[in-house]
Design a protein with these regions (language model features):
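N-terminal segments that mediate ammonia production and transfer
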Residues: 1-124, 132-167, 172-173
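Generic non-transmembrane alpha-helix signal with a bias for helix starts/N-cap capping motifs
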Residues: 124-125, 195
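PRPP/pyrophosphate-binding module of the type I phosphoribosyltransferase fold
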Residues: 164-202
Length: 202
């Protein structure tokens, strides 16, 4: 939660730290956001992450702690796996780096025989790139995402609309798919809508 006051901004993180708040700093200014990806183009550097339940006041002179953080944290793992933008960092861990490392470890240990690996965009791509490196196989962009007119497939309230969005948002490339043993990395774990449709297409 962020509150704008006459003498600064009060930033408060939820008691369990499930969602992040990160403080950015540049000459003569501080900023607070839930996504560190908003900082680079504005000239801010990450200064610190608020702890669970921590409250601070930001002003031009610095950061004043109003409440100390709780000891226990229950941050949402979906931030790295699903929701997070690739350039964002949560608790000092970059989203794309976590996805890549997860795929890398799978590729190093998986015994499946595959010709190439593919990622279901967007968040499955980082994991697939890591898998390809760990497995020693090429990465192919066999499914592309068309986003100008469609929201995230898990957000519509009706299943009929979720299924339509999932179907229309991803376009398979037959030239990259046909005759190949493919391994797909997918993050369709909220409702599983895209996973079911992609299996049918393949």
């Amino acid at each position: 939660m962020l509150l704008l006051t006459e003498d600064g901004i009060i930033a408060a993180r939820d008691r369990w730290g499930r969602t992040p708040i990160v403080i950015g700093k540049k000459d003569g200014a501080y900023a607070a956001t839930s996504e560190s990806s908003s900082f680079p183009n504005l000239g801010y550097e990450i200064d610190r992450y608020l702890g669970p339940g921590e409250i601070v006041r930001l002003h031009a002179e610095g950061v004043e702690q109003m409440r100390k953080p709780n000891e226990e944290m229950q941050i949402c793992s979906f931030l790295w796996v699903y929701y997070g933008f690739p350039t964002s960092c949560y608790e000092g861990k970059n989203v794309e780096d976590v996805r890549f490392d997860s795929g890398l470890k799978m590729g190093q240990t998986d015994t499946s025989e595959v010709d190439c690996t593919c990622g279901i965009p967007d968040s499955g791509v980082g994991m697939a790139l890591g898998y390809a490196e760990g497995k020693g196989v090429p990465y192919h962009r066999a499914i592309s995402k068309y986003t100008p007119t469609w929201p995230r497939s898990f957000t519509p309230s009706r299943q009929e609309m979720r299924s339509l969005v999932a179907k229309m948002i991803l376009i398979p490339n037959r030239a990259m798919l046909e005759g190949k043993r493919l391994l797909f990395c997918d993050d369709s774990i909220v409702r599983g809508t895209q996973l079911r449709d992609n299996v049918k297409v393949l």
